[in-house]
Curated annotation (Swiss-Prot):
InterPro entries: Cyt_b/b6_C, Cyt_b/b6_C_sf, Cyt_b/b6_N, Cytb/b6-like_sf, Cytochrome_b, Cytochrome_b_C_euk/bac, Cytochrome_b_N_euk/bac, Di-haem_cyt_TM. It is a multi-pass membrane protein. Heme 1 (or BL or b562) is low-potential and absorbs at about 562 nm, and heme 2 (or BH or b566) is high-potential and absorbs at about 566 nm. It comes from the Eukaryota. GO terms for biological process: mitochondrial electron transport, ubiquinol to cytochrome c. It comes from Akodon juninensis (Junin grass mouse). The keyword Lyase does not apply. Binds 2 heme b groups non-covalently. The cytochrome bc1 complex contains 11 subunits: 3 respiratory subunits (MT-CYB, CYC1 and UQCRFS1), 2 core proteins (UQCRC1 and UQCRC2) and 6 low-molecular weight proteins (UQCRH/QCR6, UQCRB/QCR7, UQCRQ/QCR8, UQCR10/QCR9, UQCR11/QCR10 and a cleavage product of UQCRFS1). This cytochrome bc1 complex then forms a dimer. The lineage of its organism: Eukaryota, Metazoa, Chordata, Craniata, Vertebrata. Component of the ubiquinol-cytochrome c reductase complex (complex III or cytochrome b-c1 complex) that is part of the mitochondrial respiratory chain. The b-c1 complex mediates electron transfer from ubiquinol to cytochrome c. Contributes to the generation of a proton gradient across the mitochondrial membrane that is then used for ATP synthesis. CDD domains: cytochrome_b_C, Cytochrome_b_N. PANTHER family: CYTOCHROME B (PTHR19271:SF16). It is found in: Mitochondrion inner membrane. This is Cytochrome b.
Length: 379
């Protein structure tokens, strides 16, 4: 068996990636989230496949087809709620994975980091088009509001919006194409994830100390396969608790009402995992400015490798930047809260302050703290 796994053309790739892979001996549980994201992706593809067998992407039957899945299909309610809450688990793991990357300086591996940003954007696009499919009130109005943002693009904006809609409003053509996108994008995510792994295994993993670990490596199997399995079981436990006991806690009550173009919900908002970006979008009064800020809120992650001036890897020995990092996390939570609030005082003002703080921390405070710490080391 040993000879086979080391010599067989296909098994050799698996062996080098998951069995004999030299791994730092000190990586903590924060490194588990890569495998958890892979697990979430598999769960989403499998549950999504079974949902697609019963779903109809037509404006007249989409809402009732989801109701049919929950009522008449064997364990359809479970598949539907695993898929809906699986998306939330996916984003929780994604945010922690990115947060760990920032804390421990994983952005130094720039190719892996940049592919990760593309993965993040693709996952956000997949979740957005997926949210439209049940064709409830929030699905319809969320799709209308977010796609309408493209009209802020000079000259081609209105044409682009009508092209995406497939008409003069969000309608049957929009729903059909969004279903097609939602079906194909997870497979693109899978391909990108393999490229992400490929680049990671070219350089090897980072580790909590931020020091070179070439002299202290252990094989991935059995040490980290066991550790990852524990993480996967805990993830499945949390997902099952969510799906079985609190299936609608992260959803929107408006989505239990079929889409009605003549009745606008009181507060239009996306799913919870987009609220931080939505708050940044709303905090700028100008439409084009808001759209640019929304895009920059994600693309600014690409600036981390460029703005890094620290002589140390990661924040474990950098107390000043550690404080700034945790302020940044708290600020993100404030933005998430504000994104779900109505557009009125004091929420608008808090949102504007939090949005300015978000960009200030990344562009100014972190590089300045890096310089301060470099000077402290010299003393």
């Amino acid at each position: 068996m040993k000879v086979l796994r080391k010599n067989h053309p296909l098994l050799k790739i698996v062996n080098h990636s998951f069995i004999d892979l030299p791994t730092p001996s000190n990586i903590s549980s924060w490194w588990n989230f890569g495998s958890l994201l892979g697990t979430c992706l598999v769960i989403q593809i499998l549950t999504g496949l079974f949902l697609a067998m019963h779903y109809t992407s037509d404006t007249t039957t989409a809402f009732s087809s989801v109701a049919h899945i929950c009522r008449d299909v064997n364990y359809g309610w479970l598949i539907r709620y695993l898929h809906a809450n699986g998306a939330s688990m996916f984003f929780i793991c994604l945010f922690i994975h990115v947060g760990r990357g920032i804390y421990y300086g994983s952005y130094i591996l720039s190719e892996t980091w940049n592919i990760g940003i593309i993965l993040f954007l693709t996952t956000m696009a997949t979740a957005f088009v997926g949210y439209v499919l049940p064709w409830g009130q929030m699905s319809f109005w969320g799709a209308t509001v977010i796609t309408n943002l493209l009209s802020a693009i000079p000259y081609i904006g209105n044409t682009l919006v009508e092209w995406i809609w497939g008409g003069f409003s969000v309608d049957k053509a929009t729903l059909t194409r969004f279903f097609a996108f939602h079906f194909i994008l997870p497979f693109i995510i899978t391909a990108l994830a393999l490229v992400h792994l490929l680049f990671l295994h070219e350089t090897g993993s980072n580790n909590p100390s931020g020091l070179n670990s070439d002299s202290d490596k252990i094989p991935f199997h059995p040490y980290y396969t066991t550790k990852d399995l524990l993480g996967i079981f805990l993830l499945l436990l949390v997902l099952m608790i969510l799906a079985l006991f609190f299936p609608d806690v992260l959803g929107d009550p408006d989505n239990f009402t079929p889409a009605n173009p003549l009745n606008t919900p009181a507060h239009i908002k996306p799913e919870w995992y987009f609220l931080f970006a939505y708050a940044i979008l709303r905090s700028i009064p100008n439409k084009l400015g808001g759209v640019l800020a929304l895009i920059l809120s994600i693309l600014i992650l690409a600036a981390f490798p460029l703005l890094n001036t620290s002589k140390q890897h990661g924040l474990i020995f950098r107390p000043v930047t550690q404080v700034i990092y945790w302020i940044f996390i708290a600020n993100l939570l404030v933005l998430t809260w504000i994104g779900g609030q109505p557009v009125e005082y004091p929420f608008t003002m808090i949102g504007q302050i939090a949005s300015i703080t978000y960009f200030t921390i990344i562009i100014i405070l972190m590089p300045v703290s890096n310089t301060i710490e470099n000077n402290i080391i010299k003393l």
